[in-house]
């Protein structure tokens, strides 16, 4: 699922979804040239952690894809596991994205590509059992 849009500093993207029982889901903010300005990938018992050789467990992987190549991943470990419904918000600040999960600040992510080049927001359940309930843009960023 996706929405086509323009996005800039001071705006937020909200995605509400039922978390997968296993696997991964991602929310991507993509520029018109295919650059992935922001990739946030929730992994619940998925794939392989090269450090441990075991699956990733309850982690957010945050990254960007510039010129066809992924950058260095940033990770948020131990994402809450008792929650079934996730309300995820990412807001464009002056120099970075602020990321919230269920109204709790979980990370900031410095821009690696201009945020005003965004033309699409995508939600991908990667073939697992996550269910998207809402995907929208909020103008302007909600006040806390």
Swiss-Prot record:
Keywords: Lectin. SUPFAM superfamilies: Concanavalin A-like lectins/glucanases. Gene3D superfamilies: 2.60.120.200. Pfam families: Gal-bind_lectin (PF00337). Residues 1-138 form the Galectin domain. One of its GO terms (molecular function) is carbohydrate binding. Lectin that binds beta-galactoside and a wide array of complex carbohydrates. This is Galectin b. It comes from Aplysina lactuca. The lineage of its organism: Eukaryota, Metazoa, Porifera, Demospongiae, Verongimorpha.
């Amino acid at each position: 699922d996706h929405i086509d849009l323009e996005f800039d500093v001071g705006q937020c993207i909200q995605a509400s979804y039922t978390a997968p029982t296993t696997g991964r889901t991602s929310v991507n903010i993509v520029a018109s040239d295919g650059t992935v300005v922001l990739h946030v990938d929730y992994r619940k018992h998925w794939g392989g952690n090269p450090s441990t050789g075991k699956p990733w467990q309850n982690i957010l992987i945050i990254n960007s894809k510039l010129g066809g190549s992924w950058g260095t991943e940033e990770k948020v470990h131990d994402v809450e596991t008792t929650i079934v419904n996730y309300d995820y918000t990412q807001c464009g600040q002056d120099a970075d994205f602020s990321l919230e999960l269920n109204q709790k600040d979980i990370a900031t992510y410095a821009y690696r590509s201009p945020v005003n080049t965004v033309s699409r927001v995508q939600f991908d359940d990667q073939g697992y059992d996550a269910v998207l309930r809402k995907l929208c843009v909020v103008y302007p960023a909600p006040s806390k």
